[in-house]
């Protein structure tokens, strides 16, 4: 996962399996990191372009507000929701991914908190992401 690079946050090792993915591109509690992961069954670059657009909007917002750090956080009302494997086995289940699923971030059973693999729903949802919304904390 992430090229076997050992990440830490303020000296504490990061275990991505302890995080929840936001839109399949950011991880709870991990500052200034966006994971660019495309579609399994469609053009990879369709999703990459949408993620890049969101990142540009975040960077512009950070520049305008003088912030240097952004972190995604689960809203309090979602904190008790079941955390599911990153990919639903019924949607995509190659052996190479299933073998390392325990290393992957988790997802919730909510579109904003997973990588849905559905371009037709994500294209509208990504365009509507409120980068100043409750999921984002800027410092």
Segments from the language model and where they lie:
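Glycine-rich loop(s) and the adjacent beta-strand/alpha-helix scaffold that form part
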Residues: 1-44
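C-terminal, flexible cofactor-proximal segment of oxidoreductases
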Residues: 21, 32-139
């Amino acid at each position: 996962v992430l090229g076997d690079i050992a990440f830490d946050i303020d000296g504490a090792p990061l275990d991505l399996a302890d995080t929840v993915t936001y839109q399949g591109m950011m991880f709870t509690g991990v500052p200034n990191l966006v994971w660019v992961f495309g579609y399994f069954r469609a053009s990879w670059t369709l999703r990459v372009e949408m993620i890049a657009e969101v990142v540009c909007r975040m960077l512009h917002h950070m520049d305008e507000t003088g912030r240097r750090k952004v972190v995604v956080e689960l809203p309090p009302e979602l904190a008790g929701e079941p955390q599911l494997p990153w990919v639903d086995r019924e949607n995509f289940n190659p052996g190479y991914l299933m073998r390392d699923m325990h290393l992957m971030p988790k997802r919730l059973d909510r579109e904003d908190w997973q990588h849905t693999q559905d371009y037709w729903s994500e294209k509208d949802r990504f365009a509507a992401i409120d980068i100043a919304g409750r999921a984002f904390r800027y410092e």
